[in-house]
A protein has these predicted regions:
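Aromatic "clamp/platform" in nucleotide-sugar-dependent glycosyltransferases that forms part
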Residues: 322
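Conserved donor-binding/catalytic core segment of Leloir-type glycosyltransferases
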Residues: 4, 218-237, 243-248, 258-261
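N-terminal subdomain of nucleotide-sugar transferases
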Residues: 1-52, 60, 114
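Nucleotide-activated donor-binding/catalytic signature segment of Leloir-type glycosyltransferases, i.e.
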Residues: 272-301
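Conserved acidic donor-binding segment of nucleotide-sugar-dependent glycosyltransferases
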Residues: 354-355, 359-366, 375-380
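Short alpha-helical donor nucleotide-sugar binding micro-motif in glycosyltransferases
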Residues: 85, 309-314
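Membrane-proximal helix-turn-helix segments that form the acceptor-binding/catalytic region
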Residues: 31, 127, 143-180, 190, ...
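Short hydrophobic beta-strand element within catalytic cores of glycosyltransferases
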Residues: 339-342
Length: 415
């Protein structure tokens, strides 16, 4: 079977082929790609990025599409995609996500080439709904402010929200036309049907990064009273809520620390201050208000292996997002058996059953979040029981072989 994939970024195997360097870890899309190639599928991958077209072997070829702002539709892409469809003659077209403008361009191209009934899109994030929760818990005056960086980029919090709304409009147009969609939670199922009641919804869980299928959290080896969050990059991750909750955690556990990936949002150098966004400025204000500056650990950009170690080092993993579908970060924490606390948003309850596998709290309730972190700290070794139950569940949800079988079944149904 011939598959035409549309990806938001280049899979690792393609980056490796272009650079001539070995792959540094296997990400989730590579996991799926390699499985399909082993099963005899021929796959052409189109991805956002740069580089010349290439051929890895008889099972896989690739080409880049230009990176333009996600929220601005590029009509010229339609003709490029039509040419790809005519040249490759795929049995199935698969767009990994509908949250970028190129997904709509592929939908329109498939329709023009008579291939729309043989196209499917996987739901990843849904910008239309993310936009509704983008500013949750952030004061209005903070949302309206602009740092120099925001002013130059036209990218303060409200402007970021507007871009999500625009992406949501393109996403909605794509879903309204599509005949088939792949999802994995009750939440994305409801969202898809609310946009297009007649769409055929296919269930398929996600496979995660390969390295997270090995390793096991151990209370004796973790950093006691430490919390790990996977991102503070933008408001939807809800790190402002976590800072407020963590201030209460520190009252009970003065030695507590909070680690997060990425660079510090509290720059000390002049250039860093010039690059600071209004959301980062707000996080800095909260950190200083609650005197948390010395409690925060910024881990920078992490490889998959280093990210895994950050989970294993933590006493507790926290997902404080204002909205998620099926967050990979929570899935990775569960696969490793890390005791976790998660906001009750989107499809979280499809991933983790509370309280037997971890604790779930109402999004925005910083008191409940703090209490649940404190509770897990106090459980000490006993928290391993929750982590083990979560691990068992995640091994079923993220079973690579089962998920590959489900995906191949979907492809057979719509070819």
């Amino acid at each position: 079977m011939k598959l035409l994939w549309l990806c938001n970024s280049a899979p690792g195997v393609i980056r490796s082929h272009i650079s001539g360097k070995p792959m540094s870890g296997v990400n989730w899309v590579d996991h799926v790609l390699s499985g399909l190639r082993r099963q005899g599928f021929t796959i052409r991958v189109l991805y956002r990025g740069t580089g010349e077209p290439g051929i890895i072997d008889e099972t896989c070829s690739y080409a880049a599409i230009s990176e333009t702002p996600e929220h601005i539709y590029v009509p010229e892409l339609e003709e490029k995609f039509r040419e790809e469809i005519r040249a490759f003659q795929p049995d199935v077209i698969h767009s990994w996500g509908v949250e970028y403008h190129h997904a709509l361009a592929m939908v329109n191209a498939a329709e023009a080439e008579g291939k729309l009934s043989h196209m499917v899109a996987s739901i990843q994030g849904l910008c239309r709904f993310l936009a509704e929760h983008y500013t949750d818990g952030i004061p209005g005056n903070v949302c309206r402010k602009s740092t120099l960086r925001d002013f130059l980029r036209k990218d303060n919090i409200l402007q970021q929200q507007e871009k999500f709304l625009l992406r949501g409009q393109l996403e909605t147009k794509a879903l309204e036309k599509l005949h088939h969609v792949i999802g994995r939670t009750n939440w994305d199922h409801g969202c898809a049907l609310s946009i297009h009641p007649e769409i055929a919804y296919h269930f398929c869980n996600e496979t995660l990064r390969e390295s997270f299928y090995e390793g096991h959290w151990d209370y004796q080896n973790c950093k006691k009273h430490s919390v790990f969050a996977s991102s503070c990059a933008y408001p939807i991750k809800g790190f402002h809520y976590l800072l407020e909750a963590f201030a209460r955690v520190v009252e009970a556990y003065p030695d507590a620390t909070l680690a997060v990936t990425g660079s510090s949002f509290m720059p000390t150098d002049f250039k860093g201050k010039l690059r600071q966004s209004s959301y980062e400025k707000y996080l800095e204000t909260l950190a200083k208000k609650y005197r948390l500056e010395e409690k925060l650990v910024f881990l920078g950009h992490l490889s998959a292996e280093k990210m895994k170690q950050a989970y294993l080092d933590a006493n507790v993993f926290v997902l404080s997002s204002t909205l998620e579908n099926s967050p990979n970060s929570l899935g990775e924490a569960m696969l490793l058996g890390v005791p976790s606390v998660a906001a009750d948003v989107g499809g979280v309850r499809d991933l983790m059953k509370g309280p037997s596998e971890g604790f779930i709290y109402k999004s925005g309730d910083v008191t409940a979040l703090a209490e649940q972190i404190i509770h897990l700290f106090a459980m000490e070794e006993e928290a391993s029981r929750l982590g083990e139950a979560a691990r068992n569940h995640a091994q079923i949800t993220h079973d690579p072989e089962q998920n590959l079988r489900e995906l191949m079944k979907i492809y057979e149904e719509i070819r």
